[in-house]
């Protein structure tokens, strides 16, 4: 069966095979997934035949109708929306799209991410040059500009998992023995072979998927990326880390303070353990299982205590943290954000940058590069969250991410505004 679709390149009349299929599973985060799609459209090279497949997991926020209106088929023929009648979970929803995909490569991408303008091109170029590569991950940044440890992970063998759950990984992060779970001994700015690629950005060679199989649907939401990465390695491929940056809000699709989250997360650990290490002796397996159940119990008790404390009216510093907003962009963006700030009574500052207004959707008549933010200074406050909201119509996503990486500070977080959405998007909040 042919896995690639022939497409005509209008520039030279040649027939090109579908190179990339981007798959995004959405659940109740329509503005975040819209922002994600916009970043993907910017990052797709014009000469690269590609498709974007969004699987909506029965969202209740009108995501399907919203995205269908924002991206009409006539204007965006490369984008397809698959609407599920129930929440299928991450693995099953991705598998539906993978089966329909036509690309040489498949990119699994979280909806709460932003990709830099050259990330896709560099990722594909690296995989083309490394035919032994089955999967590739990138440097994921949190909203405060710090690199996420989940960007490079080792396989959670019983011993590695035990070291992590006992805190040894945190105590000795650069140790090749105790710190193997996050592979903290690897440099951040160099490509490297890793063992586990995060499902938030996982570029897969379609041929590797054909060989090792799709995501295991026994995993509802967590652990499927670890399982797939392990099977890719066992299939004779290597998994790679590439130091190009994306933003990962990390959890906008998930309420991590819920009892259901704890159950699903730790159940995934047990599924992986039973699947790949079921033959291990009781002497070794029992401590691991005890540690998993203990961690889950501690997490549940902590959440119960937190809910009881809040229900009784007891709050500690940080429960409700004041915020300020620093808007950085062109005059048109600042005027629009001023209206929103006045509407929501936000404490706001405004920094004007010189740039022309944006052009067509997904493009900019003048994109400000990283040097446009060289002189941007934002003061951090110890008791107040600062949202630095960038003009996404005038400033490249790469420039935003570069500034955040150069200025990582606690309580200083990245936000965006674009005219087409008319919304201020920050971590865990959308205003407009």
Residue ranges of each PLM-predicted region?
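Short, well-formed alpha-helical segments that are part of the catalytic scaffolds
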Residues: 29-44
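A conserved acidic beta->alpha catalytic loop
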Residues: 39, 56-65, 86
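Glycine-rich, basic loop-to-helix element that forms the pyrophosphate-binding segment
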Residues: 81-101, 122
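Short aromatic/hydrophobic "clamp" motif used to bind/position activated sugar donors
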Residues: 106
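Conserved donor NDP-sugar-binding/catalytic core segment of glycosyltransferases
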Residues: 114-150
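Short, flexible, basic/aromatic active-site loop/helix in glycosyltransferases
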Residues: 155-194
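A short, conserved alpha-helix in the catalytic core of glycosyltransferases
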Residues: 187-190, 195-245, 403-404
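Active-site-adjacent helix/loop segment of glycosyltransferases
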Residues: 230-308
């Amino acid at each position: 069966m042919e896995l690639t679709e022939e497409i005509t390149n209008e520039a030279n009349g040649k027939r090109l095979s579908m190179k990339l299929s981007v798959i995004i599973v959405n659940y109740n985060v329509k503005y975040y997934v819209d922002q994600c799609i916009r970043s993907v459209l910017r990052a797709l090279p014009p000469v690269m035949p590609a498709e974007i497949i969004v699987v909506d997991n029965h969202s209740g926020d009108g995501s399907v109708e919203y995205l269908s209106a924002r991206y009409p088929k006539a204007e965006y023929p490369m984008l397809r929306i698959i609407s599920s009648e129930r929440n299928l979970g991450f693995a099953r929803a991705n598998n539906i799209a993978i089966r329909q995909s036509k690309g040489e490569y498949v990119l699994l991408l979280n909806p709460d991410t932003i990709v830099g303008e050259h990330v896709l091109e560099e990722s594909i170029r690296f995989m083309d040059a490394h035919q032994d590569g089955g999967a590739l991950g990138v440097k994921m940044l949190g909203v405060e500009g710090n690199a996420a440890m989940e960007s490079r992970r080792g396989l959670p063998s019983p011993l590695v998992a035990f070291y992590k759950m006992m805190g040894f990984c945190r105590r000795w992060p650069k140790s090749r023995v105790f710190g193997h779970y996050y592979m903290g001994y690897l440099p951040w700015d160099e490509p490297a072979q890793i063992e586990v690629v995060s499902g938030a950005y996982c570029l897969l060679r379609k041929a590797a998927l054909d060989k090792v199989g799709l995501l295991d649907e026994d995993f509802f939401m967590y652990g499927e990326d670890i399982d797939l990465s392990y099977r890719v390695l066992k299939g004779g491929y290597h998994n790679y880390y590439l130091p190009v940056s994306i933003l990962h809000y990390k959890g906008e699709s998930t309420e991590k303070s819920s009892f259901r989250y704890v159950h699903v997360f730790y159940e995934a650990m047990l599924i992986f353990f039973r699947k790949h290490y079921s033959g291990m002796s009781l002497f070794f397996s029992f401590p691991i299982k005890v540690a998993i159940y203990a961690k889950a119990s501690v997490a549940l008790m902590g959440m119960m205590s937190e809910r009881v404390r809040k229900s009784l009216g007891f709050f500690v510093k940080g429960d409700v943290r004041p915020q300020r907003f620093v808007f950085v962009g062109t005059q048109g963006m600042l005027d629009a954000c001023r209206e929103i700030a006045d509407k929501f009574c936000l404490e706001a500052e405004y920094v004007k940058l010189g740039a022309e207004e944006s052009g067509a959707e997904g493009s900019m008549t003048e994109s400000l590069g990283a040097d446009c933010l060289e002189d941007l200074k934002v003061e951090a406050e110890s008791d107040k969250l600062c949202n630095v909201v960038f003009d996404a119509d005038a400033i490249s996503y790469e420039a935003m991410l570069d500034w955040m990486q150069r200025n990582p500070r606690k309580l200083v977080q990245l936000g965006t505004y674009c005219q087409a959405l008319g919304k201020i998007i920050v971590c865990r909040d959308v205003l407009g």
